[in-house]
Amino acid sequence: MKKKKIKNPLIRRIPRELLGDWKKYLVVALFLILTIGFVSGMYVANESMLVAANEGVTKYKLEDGHFELDKKADETLLAAIETGTKADVKQYYLDKAKKELDEKLDEKAYPEAYDKAWDKIVEEIDDKYADEEEKYELNDPDFTEVPVKVYENFFRNEEEDYNNDGEAEGNIRVYAKNDNVDLACLLDGAFPEKADEIAIDRMHADNVGVKVGDEISVSGQRFKVVGLIAYVNYATLHEKSTDMMFDAIKFDVAMVTQEGFDSLHKTVHYSYTWNYVDIPADEVEQKAKSDDFMKALLTQVVCADKELEDYMPRYANPAINFATDDMGSDKAMGGVLLDILIVIIAFIFAVTISNTIVKEASTIGTLRASGYTRGELVRHYISMPVIVTLLAACVGNILGYTVFKNVVVGMYYNSYSLPTYQTVWNPDAFFKTTIIPVVLMLAVNLVVIIKMMRHTPLQFLRHDLKKTKRKKAMRLPKWSFLSRFRLRIMFQNVTNYLILFVGIWFIGIMLAMAVGMPETLGYYKSNVSDMMFTNYQYVLKSYENEDGDIITTGNKDAEKFNMTSLQHKSDTLDEEISVYGIEDDSRYVKISDLSALKGNEAYISASYADKYSLSVGDTVVLDEKYENKQYEFEVAGIYDHSQTLAVFLSNEQYCEIFDMDSDAFTGYLSDSEITDIDEDEIATVITEHDITKMCDQLDHSMGSYMTYFQYLCILLSAVLIYLLTKLIIEKNENAISMTKILGYENREIASLYLLSTTIVLVVIDVVSVILGVVIMKAVWRIMLFLQWMVRFSHKHDGLCENVPVYPDRISACHGIGFQKNQAYSDGSGTEKCGITGKI
């Protein structure tokens, strides 16, 4: 007869212990379920949305880039552009110059004068072409032809009146319905079929309260909203690529029929999108192809007597990339948050088990003496935290794929214009929200339990578990009995209070961020006028118009300024610094002795000085981003009335240092609107609205969730306090019994332990606040909240941090000769930030 295997009797203790202390384990489980569930939901939502976005590239025929011309291109030009080859610009200019010369001068009648004029023209064209050839690398030996497919994607910028009150609430960009490129995902209703029907962006509609069936006015013309859509090339509603923040409240994109498009009256923007014939493998190849295609496009456009108004490759388009980049960073943040909270809970479990082992020392000694091995006891005591964590991870993942996923998706849909998605299985979420928490819990508790189990059976039986024995009791102050009792409780539970401190400190920092963000946005909006130099800041495409004349204004408030962007490089961070050229005795940037600056002397902003600990007399070294050039500036003074990281020079100094024409400038500062400069000459206008709309959008997208996050932090703090207070009481069961025997009432006993914990908690809270302030200041100095909040730049894996609108290359298409746009460009084809680029 086969001998029946005897089950390990220790297994029976596990469910009994769970039921016996179910409140504690339930609180821990809920803590883990909420944390794991939310992070799991974040991973699942992220992956599902990113998969939908990646599939949308093909499904909705996303562009590889777009450009805009001043006039509609004919079939010949489009066919030439699609070849990806360069036109012979020099020969084109020679032919055109010869034609104009022939019209003005008869070669046969005045052969000598004709030859002399022609030689001079050739010389000028050679010199000018040589400069532009070097600047734009038109004869780059590594140039490769980039064949593309070009599609028309015209639009009109109209005014939107969504409540039909007769006043425009914002702008709406209207596209005609097409089936070729940059398609839209229909989220509600239907696509327009009639001339008076329109489909608008879903997120904008949610923000302003427009629903399917409502009517809106587009530049005074009524349209019926028949659908809510999400354009694949407008995941975020950036009206301009240089906008500091997308604006889904005062900017909208829409689709109408071709008849509806033709019925509108605003200027048509001749925008063309392209897709590469050979699909790039990654962003590195995208950038290489874009650079080559840009050179070919420039030459073809110039030779067709057209002007290039805008150029934007996909990899640098914030409207396409901002949302997906942000979702990727959320995953990393969620993973770190989960790991930290799991470690805190693991230490709570470790302290609990350590106390349990001390309490059950006699039982453990008996079991060890009866033949149970250390391994069996280690496995028994570690089973509880692992089982609770595993169950919590399973439940949390179930909730993550259902409830919390929808919460995170709702957050994204509240911020971005995203297409429909399908929930996808995410193995990364399972690994990071199930395997890693269990491993962390196992590792922390294993270390503690193995350390405790090193004692001999006799030491367990004698309750002799302390390695160091105090020869005599700690001498306490001559206070009352109850006060000394409370003090001894504090000393006996230092480990528990230390864990409580770490938990409260970490949660306190999160709570400070949750409370601080809305307050900071509110402060920023209410004080933005004090942070701006002027009410209006006009950045021009060039300081000269098409005829070569300097752009001027009759506005008496207007004041010229120069601006460029350099880098402050360090081992840890390359940070952009704005360098301004300001007029002497400026009414807007009031530096009294600016005109007295000589050579490389400069003023720097107080923010710059504070962040990098600079003072008068120090030397600042700044680098060009795309060129191997360095500039040294000697700090001559600190300018206190600027929140930007900036260097201030006189305009004369600026032009000399950056080798510019003496009359060159970037734009105008003005307290009143400038109305006598052609809109086509203006690259961007920065007003208070442009600054505050970013705050409005952030507040709208995240404000309500910050409130939820505050409640979550308070709940986590309450859970930690409950668990550790319960541990302290359990650890002192014998002492509590003795005080009861001595006649103390429950109220008095509670005051001993609860008051002790309360006192420690108050001290912990104060210390946590102080340390939190120190840490937040350190983070502040590194990131400067107001800087990342309003930068123009968008990160694209280090390939291109500034949005490249290429205004200097665009200006190359104005007139017969290439016009050098020194005032606005850094010569690399990358647009400069406006004067408030880093307020």
Where are these regions (language model features)?
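Juxtamembrane segments of multi-pass membrane proteins
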Residues: 67, 481-611, 615-618, 622-624
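Selective transmembrane-helix segments that form parts of the transport pathway or gating/packing helices
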Residues: 381-398, 434, 438, 469-476, ...
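N-terminal Sec/SRP start-transfer signal
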Residues: 1-39, 382, 386, 468-508, ...
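Short helix-loop junctions at transmembrane helix boundaries
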Residues: 396-432, 763-828
